[in-house]
From Swiss-Prot:
Species annotation: Azoarcus sp. (strain BH72)
Listed name of the protein: Ubiquinone biosynthesis O-methyltransferase
Gene: ubiG
The enzyme's E.C. designation: 2.1.1.222, 2.1.1.64
Binding-site residues for S-adenosyl-L-methionine, renumbered to this chain: 37, 56, 77, 121
Organism phylogeny: Bacteria, Pseudomonadati, Pseudomonadota, Betaproteobacteria, Rhodocyclales
Pathway named in the protein's UniProt entry: Cofactor biosynthesis; ubiquinone biosynthesis
Length: 233
């Protein structure tokens, strides 16, 4: 299996996996951001009836949200514990999602051009070779299919907000959640997409108000941002 993965990163999320669906846990920011990213994805591609792959699905927050919107969803991850939590939560939600323990690269080798929509959210900044993941996501999308990414920009403001602010001042995330050196500039992600045969459709920032604790779409891509790309062909 091509595992383009940092074992320490996989272990970090495995250790917290049992708290994935607790909205007051370390995953609180994911719970707060999920409705926004779900609406954004659905608004761009129309999830109902689509065959969707969620890369780096973790405990299944986004996967279940997309299944709830009528998509036929598969989720892949390299954390067995996170996938166990995701599968267990299906009993509570009554939804259907096919979860598999595999990497994007390994799945791409056996599932080329299989999906109408591929999502890879809050994951690229946690792998050693993000360009490889982007390429794998592109491989798995059907020609004309939609591919979505979200990650963190790499600049001083992103360091202040996503690392110093979120991890040390506001305690929104456990310390060590993010490695600033792995943050990705929009220009870099755009280049990865072009090299993988993807055409950039839309770029949107996300901002967080610590007072109202609400995330909102924004033109400001300095910290969190999302990309919608389309597979050429």
């Amino acid at each position: 299996m091509n595992t383009n993965a940092d074992p320490a990163e996989v272990q970090k999320f495995s250790d917290l996996a049992h708290r994935w669906w607790d909205p007051a846990s370390e995953f609180k920011p994911l719970h707060e951001i999920n409705p926004l990213r779900l609406d954004w994805i659905d608004g761009h591609c129309g999830l109902a009836g689509k065959k969707v792959l969620d890369v780096g699905c973790g405990g299944g927050l986004l996967s279940e949200g997309m299944a709830q919107r009528g998509a036929e969803v598969s989720g892949i991850d390299l954390s067995e514990k996170a996938l166990g939590v995701a599968r267990l939560h299906l009993y509570e939600s009554g939804l259907q999602v096919d979860y598999q323990l595999t990497s994007a690269e390994a799945h791409a080798a056996t599932h080329p051009a299989q999906f109408d929509v591929v999502t890879c959210m809050e994951m690229l900044e946690h792998v050693p070779n993000p360009e490889s993941t982007v390429h794998a996501c592109a491989q798995m999308a059907k020609p004309g299919g939609a591919v979505f990414f979200s990650t963190l920009n790499r600049n001083f403001k992103a360091y202040l907000f996503a690392v110093v602010g979120a991890e040390y001042l506001l305690n929104l995330l456990p310390r060590g959640t993010h490695d600033y050196a792995k943050f990705i500039k929009p220009s870099e992600l755009s280049r990865y997409c072009r090299n993988a045969g993807l055409e950039l459709v839309s770029l949107s920032g996300m901002t967080y108000n610590p007072i109202t604790k609400v995330y909102a779409l924004s033109r400001d891509t300095d910290v969190n941002y999302m990309v919608h790309a389309r597979k050429l062909g």
